[in-house]
């Protein structure tokens, strides 16, 4: 049915008897409307925040408090009281390079109203997993001289900070990360800890801690307050920032803001591309609110000298920055996830593939195929951008391997010039070699058209959109379609750039 032409004017034309019915879903009370996003401000956040104030503990107290936590974890009596102790131990983290604590400070007067003085629940927290298999101990337990109190205190607080990751991670994460936790403690502090080497957990035990964090808003508030304090206080060149980055920041920041997180990751690799241009390349009709929110973040929050509360605010209220969540931007999320997988170095395990996000896995196969096409198109736009920008960022080998010469600025007329000369002759070049074959889920291999109009591609880079023509029917005997010049010339001005290609 793709060959049927749909006139432009019919898509917005109402039937005569329905002209006054212009309501959209959000304007019909009984419709299944989305939960509205809450506008983020620090003032709005503080009205919802309560946290436990953490005070300094000496080394022997840290050791004795940890012993009590271990007893409760082992006995299955772990409660909010023990969870509070875990938070206190975590945020008594010692600085790795000098004396003092990373997180302990006098709470400023504009935050003191959020300190809780309520009594803490002592009811045991239920486990949500039944697996009682112990995590592997990969380091030998030290023998000989007993571990000194200072080293033990450092190791306990370091471990408790890692346990705070359960705010956003599953118990299996701690099980598999325990080896790297031991290794990084050694590299940061220049010490080996018998306590840290000997520690073991089960998923069942860790699930109680995770369930406690999810149950008690005071725990989440405490984690939020001290993490945002450290992120706001320490610069990236500070050694305290480094230890916090490993233990907490990289895991907790931008939680639930998948769209923004993946855009930043991609921009790090495509460092010559401005964020506004990247958004122009990847936006779609359903992403309007996400684009507005990203502009809001860039303009008001994600800049030097601004409190970092916004990065962790969804721990307090998950309706903050809701418009950049994956569920509200499934197509853009899938597009960015694929681009991240192909161009951004990934971790290991469950987090090695950003396409494992649940909403992407649930996408229809046909929609995934369209995403794959758009991914290839964005990659081609990026390569063209590097070359057409006329900078030295695209080296000789890079440009030659893509069959394109570095352009003389005179060759590429400006967008305004092109519009002023609609009848000028267009210059066509074939990509040599042609673009890489795109592997689709139905295992058919089809190619995007290798014929491009340089001027219209330049317009596309600037955000000018062309009408997309219906795709041709593919002969059963061929898996490769090359557009005829007549079809390419159908659009006004003599050029059609059809990103579908099949």
From Swiss-Prot:
The keyword Ribonucleoprotein applies. Signal peptide: none annotated. It comes from the Viruses. It is found in: Virion; Host cytoplasm. GO terms for molecular function: RNA binding. Keywords: Capsid protein, Helical capsid protein, Host cytoplasm, Ribonucleoprotein, RNA-binding, Superantigen, Viral nucleoprotein, Virion. InterPro entries: Rhabdo_ncap_2. The keyword DNA damage does not apply. Residues 415-445 are annotated as: Disordered. One of its GO terms (cellular component) is viral nucleocapsid. Homomultimerizes to form the nucleocapsid. Binds to viral genomic RNA. Encapsidates the genome, protecting it from nucleases. If expressed without protein P it binds non-specifically RNA and therefore can bind it's own mRNA. Interaction with protein P abolishes any non-specific RNA binding, and prevents phosphorylation. The soluble N-P complex encapsidates specifically the genomic RNA, with protein N protecting the genome like a pearl necklace. The encapsidated genomic RNA is termed the nucleocapsid (NC) and serves as template for viral transcription and replication. Protein N binds protein P in the NC through a different interaction, and can be phosphorylated. Belongs to the nucleorhabdovirus nucleocapsid protein family. This is Nucleoprotein. The lineage of its organism: Viruses, Riboviria, Orthornavirae, Negarnaviricota, Haploviricotina.
């Amino acid at each position: 049915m793709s060959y049927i032409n749909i006139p432009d004017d019919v898509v917005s034309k109402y039937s005569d008897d329905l002209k006054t019915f212009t309501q959209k879903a959000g304007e019909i009370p009984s419709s299944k409307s989305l939960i509205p996003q809450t506008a983020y401000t620090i003032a709005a956040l503080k009205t919802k925040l309560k946290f436990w104030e953490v005070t300094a503990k000496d080394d022997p107290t840290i050791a004795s408090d940890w012993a009590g936590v271990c007893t409760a974890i082992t006995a299955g009596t772990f409660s909010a009281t023990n969870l509070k102790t875990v938070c206190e131990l975590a945020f008594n983290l010692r600085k790795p390079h000098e004396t003092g604590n990373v997180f302990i400070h006098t709470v400023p007067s504009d935050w003191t109203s959020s300190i809780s003085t309520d009594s803490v629940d002592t009811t045991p927290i239920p486990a949500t997993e039944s697996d009682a298999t112990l995590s592997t101990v990969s380091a030998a337990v030290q023998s000989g001289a007993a571990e000194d109190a200072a080293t033990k205190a450092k190791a306990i607080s370091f471990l408790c900070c890692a346990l705070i990751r359960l705010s956003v991670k599953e118990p299996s994460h701690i099980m598999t990360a325990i080896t790297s936790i031991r290794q990084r403690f050694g590299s940061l502090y220049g010490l080996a800890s018998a306590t840290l080497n000997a520690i073991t957990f089960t998923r069942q035990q860790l699930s109680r801690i995770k369930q406690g964090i999810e149950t008690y808003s005071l725990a989440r508030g405490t984690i939020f307050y001290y993490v945002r304090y450290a992120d706001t206080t320490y610069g990236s060149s500070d050694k305290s920032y480094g230890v916090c980055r490993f233990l907490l920041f990289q895991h907790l920041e931008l939680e639930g803001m998948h769209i923004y997180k993946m855009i930043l990751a991609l921009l790090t690799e495509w460092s010559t591309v401005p964020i506004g241009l990247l958004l122009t390349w990847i936006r779609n009709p359903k992403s309007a609110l996400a684009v507005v929110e990203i502009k809001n973040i860039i303009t008001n929050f994600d800049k030097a000298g601004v409190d970092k509360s916004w990065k962790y605010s969804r721990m307090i209220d998950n309706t903050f920055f809701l418009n950049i969540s994956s569920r509200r931007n499934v197509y853009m999320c899938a597009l960015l996830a694929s681009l991240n997988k192909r161009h951004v170095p990934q971790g290991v395990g469950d987090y090695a593939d950003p396409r494992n996000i649940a909403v992407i896995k649930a996408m229809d196969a046909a929609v995934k195929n369209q995403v794959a096409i758009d991914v290839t198109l964005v990659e081609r736009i990026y390569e063209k951008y590097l070359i057409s920008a006329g900078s030295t960022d695209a080296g000789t080998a890079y440009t030659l391997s893509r069959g394109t010469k570095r352009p003389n600025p005179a060759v590429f007329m400006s967008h305004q010039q092109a519009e002023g000369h609609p009848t000028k002759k267009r210059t066509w070049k074939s990509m040599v070699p042609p673009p890489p074959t795109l592997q689709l889920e139905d295992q058919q291999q089809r190619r995007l058209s290798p014929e491009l109009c340089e001027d219209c591609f330049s317009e596309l880079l600037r955000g000018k959109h062309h009408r997309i023509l219906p795709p041709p029917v593919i002969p059963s005997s061929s898996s490769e379609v090359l557009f005829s010049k007549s079809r390419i010339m159908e659009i006004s001005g003599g050029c059609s750039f059809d990103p579908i290609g099949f």
